[in-house]
Amino acid sequence: MQKSWRNIAIALAGMTQCARQVEELAKTGYLKTEVFETAVKSLINTDPSSAEDVFGGLDAVQPGLSTLKDILEDHRSPGNADILRYVLGAVVLQKRLARRKDVLYIIGNRLEKVSQQVEHFGCSHDNVVSNIADIYTDTISKFPYRIQVTGEFNYLQQERVAAQIRSLLFAAIRAATLWRQAGGTRWHMLFYRSKMLAATEQLLQRA
Protein backbone atom coordinates (compact mmCIF):
# COMPACT_ATOMS: atom_id res chain seq x y z
CA MET A 1 0.00 0.00 0.00
CA GLN A 2 1.43 3.34 -1.07
CA LYS A 3 1.90 5.74 1.84
CA SER A 4 0.26 9.06 1.01
CA TRP A 5 -2.09 11.65 2.50
CA ARG A 6 -4.63 10.62 -0.13
CA ASN A 7 -4.72 7.00 1.03
CA ILE A 8 -4.67 8.04 4.68
CA ALA A 9 -7.71 10.26 4.04
CA ILE A 10 -9.55 7.45 2.23
CA ALA A 11 -8.93 5.06 5.12
CA LEU A 12 -10.02 7.66 7.67
CA ALA A 13 -13.15 8.28 5.61
CA GLY A 14 -13.92 4.57 5.82
CA MET A 15 -13.56 4.67 9.59
CA THR A 16 -15.61 7.83 10.06
CA GLN A 17 -18.33 6.54 7.74
CA CYS A 18 -18.75 3.42 9.86
CA ALA A 19 -18.51 5.41 13.09
CA ARG A 20 -21.17 7.88 12.00
CA GLN A 21 -23.50 5.05 11.01
CA VAL A 22 -22.96 3.40 14.40
CA GLU A 23 -23.89 6.67 16.09
CA GLU A 24 -26.98 7.15 13.94
CA LEU A 25 -28.10 3.54 14.33
CA ALA A 26 -27.64 3.58 18.11
CA LYS A 27 -29.54 6.84 18.56
CA THR A 28 -32.26 6.62 15.91
CA GLY A 29 -32.44 2.99 14.82
CA TYR A 30 -31.95 4.13 11.22
CA LEU A 31 -29.54 2.28 8.93
CA LYS A 32 -28.41 3.54 5.52
CA THR A 33 -28.36 0.36 3.45
CA GLU A 34 -25.73 1.58 0.99
CA VAL A 35 -23.37 2.56 3.83
CA PHE A 36 -23.82 -0.80 5.52
CA GLU A 37 -23.24 -2.70 2.29
CA THR A 38 -20.03 -0.74 1.69
CA ALA A 39 -18.88 -1.79 5.17
CA VAL A 40 -19.63 -5.46 4.52
CA LYS A 41 -17.90 -5.41 1.14
CA SER A 42 -14.78 -3.91 2.71
CA LEU A 43 -14.59 -6.86 5.11
CA ILE A 44 -14.65 -9.49 2.37
CA ASN A 45 -12.53 -7.66 -0.21
CA THR A 46 -9.31 -9.62 0.29
CA ASP A 47 -7.40 -8.41 -2.77
CA PRO A 48 -8.05 -4.69 -3.33
CA SER A 49 -6.11 -2.93 -6.08
CA SER A 50 -6.03 0.43 -4.26
CA ALA A 51 -7.18 2.17 -1.09
CA GLU A 52 -10.50 3.22 -2.62
CA ASP A 53 -11.02 -0.27 -4.05
CA VAL A 54 -11.32 -1.59 -0.50
CA PHE A 55 -14.66 0.23 -0.31
CA GLY A 56 -15.74 -0.12 -3.94
CA GLY A 57 -14.56 3.29 -5.17
CA LEU A 58 -14.49 6.90 -3.98
CA ASP A 59 -18.23 7.34 -4.42
CA ALA A 60 -18.82 4.64 -1.80
CA VAL A 61 -16.99 6.65 0.88
CA GLN A 62 -18.38 10.07 -0.04
CA PRO A 63 -20.46 10.23 3.19
CA GLY A 64 -17.34 9.38 5.17
CA LEU A 65 -15.28 12.01 3.38
CA SER A 66 -17.93 14.63 4.18
CA THR A 67 -17.97 13.61 7.84
CA LEU A 68 -14.18 13.59 7.97
CA LYS A 69 -14.08 17.10 6.50
CA ASP A 70 -16.50 18.33 9.17
CA ILE A 71 -14.40 16.76 11.94
CA LEU A 72 -11.11 18.14 10.62
CA GLU A 73 -12.63 21.62 10.40
CA ASP A 74 -14.11 21.48 13.91
CA HIS A 75 -12.86 18.48 15.87
CA ARG A 76 -14.02 20.00 19.17
CA SER A 77 -17.68 20.06 18.15
CA PRO A 78 -19.79 18.12 20.71
CA GLY A 79 -21.71 16.64 17.79
CA ASN A 80 -18.60 14.77 16.69
CA ALA A 81 -17.64 13.39 20.11
CA ASP A 82 -19.11 9.90 19.74
CA ILE A 83 -17.89 9.55 16.16
CA LEU A 84 -14.33 10.43 17.23
CA ARG A 85 -14.54 8.03 20.15
CA TYR A 86 -15.57 5.16 17.88
CA VAL A 87 -12.81 5.99 15.39
CA LEU A 88 -10.16 6.08 18.12
CA GLY A 89 -11.56 2.87 19.56
CA ALA A 90 -11.20 1.18 16.18
CA VAL A 91 -7.57 2.33 16.01
CA VAL A 92 -6.85 0.88 19.46
CA LEU A 93 -8.49 -2.46 18.66
CA GLN A 94 -6.77 -2.71 15.28
CA LYS A 95 -3.38 -2.33 16.92
CA ARG A 96 -4.18 -5.08 19.41
CA LEU A 97 -5.62 -7.31 16.72
CA ALA A 98 -2.52 -6.92 14.54
CA ARG A 99 -0.47 -8.55 17.31
CA ARG A 100 -2.70 -11.64 17.38
CA LYS A 101 -1.92 -13.73 14.32
CA ASP A 102 -4.00 -16.58 15.71
CA VAL A 103 -7.10 -14.39 15.90
CA LEU A 104 -6.43 -12.93 12.44
CA TYR A 105 -6.27 -16.47 11.05
CA ILE A 106 -9.65 -17.34 12.57
CA ILE A 107 -11.18 -14.11 11.26
CA GLY A 108 -9.82 -14.73 7.77
CA ASN A 109 -11.28 -18.24 7.61
CA ARG A 110 -14.68 -17.16 8.86
CA LEU A 111 -14.87 -14.16 6.54
CA GLU A 112 -14.40 -16.54 3.60
CA LYS A 113 -17.70 -18.14 4.61
CA VAL A 114 -19.29 -14.70 4.88
CA SER A 115 -18.15 -13.98 1.33
CA GLN A 116 -19.93 -17.11 0.14
CA GLN A 117 -23.08 -16.07 2.00
CA VAL A 118 -22.98 -12.62 0.40
CA GLU A 119 -22.91 -14.22 -3.05
CA HIS A 120 -26.15 -16.06 -2.25
CA PHE A 121 -28.06 -13.61 -0.05
CA GLY A 122 -26.55 -10.13 -0.49
CA CYS A 123 -24.75 -7.90 2.01
CA SER A 124 -27.73 -6.89 4.16
CA HIS A 125 -29.34 -10.29 4.68
CA ASP A 126 -29.96 -11.25 8.30
CA ASN A 127 -27.80 -14.38 7.98
CA VAL A 128 -24.86 -12.33 6.73
CA VAL A 129 -25.23 -9.65 9.41
CA SER A 130 -25.56 -12.25 12.15
CA ASN A 131 -22.49 -14.15 10.95
CA ILE A 132 -20.30 -11.04 10.83
CA ALA A 133 -21.50 -9.98 14.28
CA ASP A 134 -20.72 -13.44 15.64
CA ILE A 135 -17.16 -13.23 14.31
CA TYR A 136 -16.74 -9.89 16.07
CA THR A 137 -18.18 -11.27 19.31
CA ASP A 138 -16.04 -14.42 19.23
CA THR A 139 -12.77 -12.61 18.50
CA ILE A 140 -12.43 -8.85 18.91
CA SER A 141 -14.95 -8.62 21.75
CA LYS A 142 -12.69 -10.90 23.79
CA PHE A 143 -10.03 -8.19 24.07
CA PRO A 144 -9.96 -6.32 27.41
CA TYR A 145 -10.61 -3.02 25.62
CA ARG A 146 -14.09 -2.59 24.20
CA ILE A 147 -15.83 0.21 22.35
CA GLN A 148 -18.77 1.40 24.43
CA VAL A 149 -21.62 2.43 22.15
CA THR A 150 -24.05 5.00 23.55
CA GLY A 151 -27.58 5.49 22.30
CA GLU A 152 -31.23 4.76 22.93
CA PHE A 153 -31.79 1.64 25.02
CA ASN A 154 -34.82 0.64 22.94
CA TYR A 155 -32.61 0.36 19.86
CA LEU A 156 -29.49 -1.06 21.49
CA GLN A 157 -31.41 -3.95 23.02
CA GLN A 158 -32.70 -5.07 19.61
CA GLU A 159 -30.73 -8.08 18.42
CA ARG A 160 -30.65 -6.98 14.79
CA VAL A 161 -29.45 -3.46 15.65
CA ALA A 162 -26.76 -4.86 17.96
CA ALA A 163 -25.57 -7.17 15.17
CA GLN A 164 -25.47 -4.30 12.68
CA ILE A 165 -23.45 -2.16 15.12
CA ARG A 166 -20.91 -4.95 15.68
CA SER A 167 -20.60 -5.40 11.92
CA LEU A 168 -19.96 -1.68 11.43
CA LEU A 169 -17.36 -1.60 14.21
CA PHE A 170 -15.68 -4.59 12.57
CA ALA A 171 -15.54 -2.68 9.28
CA ALA A 172 -14.15 0.37 11.08
CA ILE A 173 -11.31 -1.80 12.37
CA ARG A 174 -10.75 -3.06 8.82
CA ALA A 175 -10.47 0.55 7.68
CA ALA A 176 -8.04 1.20 10.55
CA THR A 177 -5.84 -1.57 9.14
CA LEU A 178 -5.83 0.23 5.79
CA TRP A 179 -5.02 3.47 7.61
CA ARG A 180 -1.96 1.87 9.24
CA GLN A 181 -0.85 0.40 5.92
CA ALA A 182 -1.12 3.84 4.31
CA GLY A 183 1.17 5.29 6.96
CA GLY A 184 -1.43 6.70 9.33
CA THR A 185 -0.52 7.45 12.95
CA ARG A 186 -2.32 9.12 15.81
CA TRP A 187 0.17 11.98 15.61
CA HIS A 188 -1.35 12.89 12.26
CA MET A 189 -4.69 13.56 13.93
CA LEU A 190 -3.02 16.03 16.28
CA PHE A 191 -0.44 17.79 14.14
CA TYR A 192 -1.29 17.29 10.48
CA ARG A 193 -4.98 18.13 10.27
CA SER A 194 -4.38 20.75 7.56
CA LYS A 195 -2.70 18.19 5.28
CA MET A 196 -5.48 15.66 5.88
CA LEU A 197 -8.12 18.32 5.28
CA ALA A 198 -6.52 19.29 1.97
CA ALA A 199 -6.41 15.64 0.85
CA THR A 200 -10.02 15.12 1.94
CA GLU A 201 -11.25 18.17 0.05
CA GLN A 202 -9.47 17.02 -3.11
CA LEU A 203 -11.09 13.59 -2.82
CA LEU A 204 -14.54 15.14 -2.31
CA GLN A 205 -14.14 17.04 -5.56
CA ARG A 206 -13.57 13.74 -7.36
CA ALA A 207 -16.11 11.56 -5.55
From Swiss-Prot:
Transmembrane segments: none annotated. GO terms for cellular component: cytoplasm; plasma membrane. It is a peripheral membrane protein. InterPro entries: HflD, HflD-like_sf. The keyword Cell inner membrane applies. It comes from the Bacteria. It is found in: Cytoplasm; Cell inner membrane. Disulfide bonds: none annotated. Keywords: Cell inner membrane, Cell membrane, Cytoplasm, Membrane. Its main location: cytoplasm. PANTHER family: HIGH FREQUENCY LYSOGENIZATION PROTEIN HFLD (PTHR38100:SF1). NCBIfam families: PRK00218.1-2 (NF001246). Belongs to the HflD family. This is High frequency lysogenization protein HflD homolog. The lineage of its organism: Bacteria, Pseudomonadati, Pseudomonadota, Gammaproteobacteria, Cellvibrionales. The gene is hflD.
